[in-house]
Amino acid sequence: MKLGRYSLFLLCPLLASCSGNGFYKDNLGVIDKNILHADTSLLKSKNKEHYKSSDMVSKTDSIYIGNSSFQTYHGEPLPGKLEGVHGIILRSSTPLGFDEVLSMIQDSSGIPIVKHTTKDVISGGVSSKSLAATVAEKMNSATGGKSTDQFDHLLLEVSSEHQLMDVNYQGALSTFLDKVAANYNLYWTYESGRIAFSNEETKRFSISILPGGKYTSKNSISSDSNSSSGSSGSSGSSSSDSGAELKFDSDVDFWKDIENSIKLILGSDGSYSISTSTSSVIVRTSSANMKKINEYINTLNAQLERQVTIDVAIYNVTTTDSSDLAMSLEALLKHNGGVLGSVSTSNFAATSGTPSFTGYLNGNGDSSNQVLLNLLAEKGKVSVVTSASVTTMSGQPVPLKVGNDRTYVSEIGTVLSQSSTSTTASTSTVTSGFLMNLLPQVADDGNILLQYGVTLSELVGSNNGFDQATVNGTVIQLPNVDSTTFVQSSMLRNGNTLVLAGYEKKRNESVDQGVGTTSFKLLGGALNGSASRTVTVICITPRIIDLKASGE
């Protein structure tokens, strides 16, 4: 019986461990699943499947199907029997005027044709003759001569020459209607069983920008705080004056620029209406001007719809010889990319607040910067500070912050009253880490003009990053921050990696120990020292995203 009890006691921990082991496996499975999900999401944020190739010739092993679509602006489709290779046959031995051409089309197709126009220039010879007479009168008046019938007739022939059209055509009716419209600067539609020609065309265009009256881009990253604390019913407040801040202000009125461009294209021939709430423009003008407006807006939308994914990685290299690292970086970039600006091979001093080394690596499809990391690993111990990917539209800035906000007591005050004494404490916030603002602009040739502003800051105080000051027995925390801020711009090819280096931190340590005093080392002691340098290397890789090519 006792043996049975002992066995039962021994089995209890075993059963408990089995139960705990089950929970452990379940939790481990959940953790592994979350890690996998995080890694998958990180890869998706890089948009690798949408990278646009910068090669002159692109190859694919998959089936190619064009995904470009177009919209017809001529109303209803014409009858199918008139759209074939032998849809309509029109021939004339002599050039015809506008009305004669319309009569021939109507007789051959059986479709009635109407005109909606206020211009007399296409309605017949009377207006052309009047125009010729007016021009002749002005020219004769300017030259001191008198108008003659021969001169009027000559000008009439010159002014009405563009009114005539050679007709010798066989094919689709819509193609011939396009030719007629182009010859007379008109616009045609087919609706309700009839063809209508008009000297003006009305069309609505969508603009690929956000709705709003004025598109203003003001991006900033800063660390500010307001807080209060107190005792005995007292209160206090504070604001941060030691936080890090990086700001890009870009005040651009897209709609004003679009309006000025449309005015320039239309001149006095046409009208327009801009709707900033729907991001659209309605234009009414001649067919020739409408083609120019259509080309301008299509080009504008293509520029505005360009997207860029920017990979940012920051590495710290701890080494004892920074000059060797600088020369090695220079050799690597000259062989695999290029060096931008001057290079200081003696050291990596960043006293000017700007990187002393700037270059780029040619893109090879490797987003992990493995070639650069292999070189850095040969020169010292490499650690990854941060790695992130951001996506933005061409011409729109995007901020990135990887840092730590620290709150500290910046002020302590005492409030005296008749009945009590209270103490107030004011706090502030200081930010250390990495702040960046990126502004990419994709050029027509596929290159990327990249403007980047960077702020690197670090708490270096002796007491966990802070220094301390004692005032009347009260200890005040004072943040000691080392920071570097700069704004630069570079022109890069799609997929190139911009390499910024030159931010160096030196650390010198010395140890002098003895018994009683540091100079007495007979009974034991030590005297040694060490020196190290930490160089920060920033890698920025912009890549153009081609969503249309990926079928999205």
Curated annotation (Swiss-Prot):
Family to which the UniProt record says this protein belongs: Belongs to the bacterial secretin family.
Keywords linked to the UniProt accession: Cell outer membrane, Fimbrium biogenesis, Lipoprotein, Membrane, Palmitate, Plasmid, Signal
Biological role stated in the UniProt entry: Is absolutely required for pilus biogenesis, and for EPEC localized adherence and autoaggregation. Acts at a step in the BFP biogenic pathway after production and processing of the structural pilus subunit BfpA.
PROSITE patterns: PROKAR_LIPOPROTEIN
Lipid moiety-binding region (N-palmitoyl cysteine): C18
Compositionally biased residues, Low complexity: 218-243
Principal location listed in the UniProt entry: membrane
Subcellular localization(s) per the UniProt record: Cell outer membrane
Stretch forming the signal peptide: 1-17
Disulphide bond pairs: none
Membrane topology, record value: Lipid-anchor
The keyword 4Fe-4S belongs to this UniProt entry's keyword annotation: no
Native species: Escherichia coli O111:H-
Name by which UniProt lists this protein: Outer membrane lipoprotein BfpB
Induction: During exponential-phase growth; repressed by ammonium.
Entries under PANTHER family matching the protein: PROBABLE GENERAL SECRETION PATHWAY PROTEIN D, SECRETIN GSPD-RELATED
Source species, domain of life: Bacteria
Lipid moiety-binding residues (S-diacylglycerol cysteine): C18
InterPro entries listed in its UniProt record: Bact_Secretion_Sys_Channel (IPR050810), Secretin_N_2 (IPR011514), T2SS/T3SS_dom (IPR004846)
Gene Ontology BP term (one): pilus assembly
Residue stretches in coiled coil: none
Gene Ontology cellular-component terms listed: cell outer membrane
Disordered: region residues: 218-244
